[in-house]
A protein has these predicted regions:
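S-adenosylmethionine
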Residues: 1-198
């Protein structure tokens, strides 16, 4: 893959001797993942009805790999019922690792389109409060759609500058997730136009 020169130089400086291994990953097959919505169905019950073979993502209890070259889970009724979220396994990690407990007050600072927020809401199990924020009001609409589809309750949708949230909610939240908007490198294999746009 031909990467932008500025990007290559930045990554060489950042990664040093690991740069070659990093760039080699762009030539490897892409991994497709889905995360079971445990707010609606247990992992065990989903595996009983899963319409295709799934392989567990080793570090995510409700994450699975699927063969994205031959199946389209975004067209299955289970997708439209909110039983799973299509998400790269690496993107599942932040919400999985945040130690959310039922009853917590949780803020997802950069929440759209909802992959992390839906997992945080499932962990809350209808208790506590989830504040899902995204600076972009148009992206917040998609966030709302996904939270509704996933059956996540006790949620507040915000579209505010992150710096202002502290004045609205001083010392309120038990847990805060900031998976700041990315620069797009993860999309390089999915959409070649992202390489040019970087």
């Amino acid at each position: 893959m031909n990467l932008p020169k500025v990007f290559e130089e930045k990554m060489k400086d950042l990664l040093g001797s690991e740069y070659e291994a990093y760039t080699a990953c762009y030539d490897e097959p892409r991994h497709y993942g889905l995360r079971v919505n445990t707010a609606k169905i247990s992992v065990e019950d989903f595996l009983k009805i899963a319409p295709w073979p799934l392989e567990p993502v080793p570090w995510i209890h409700n994450g699975f790999y699927y063969d994205g070259d031959n199946i389209q889970p975004s067209k299955h009724p289970y997708y439209f019922a909110g039983l799973y979220y299509l998400q790269e396994p690496s993107a599942m990690t932040p919400a999985d690792r945040l130690p959310v407990e039922p009853g917590d007050r949780v803020l997802d600072v950069c929440a759209a389109p909802g992959g992390k927020a839906t997992e945080l809401g499932a962990k809350l199990g209808g208790t506590g409060v989830l504040a899902a924020n995204d600076l972009s009001s148009s992206r917040a609409k998609g966030l709302l759609k996904n939270l509704e589809l996933f059956g996540i309750g006790n949620v507040l949708i915000l579209s505010e500058e992150p710096g202002k949230l502290v004045s609205y909610f001083p010392e309120y939240f038990d847990k805060i997730l900031i998976d700041a908007p990315c620069s797009g490198e993860g999309m390089f294999r999915k959409e070649k136009k992202m390489v040019k746009a970087w």
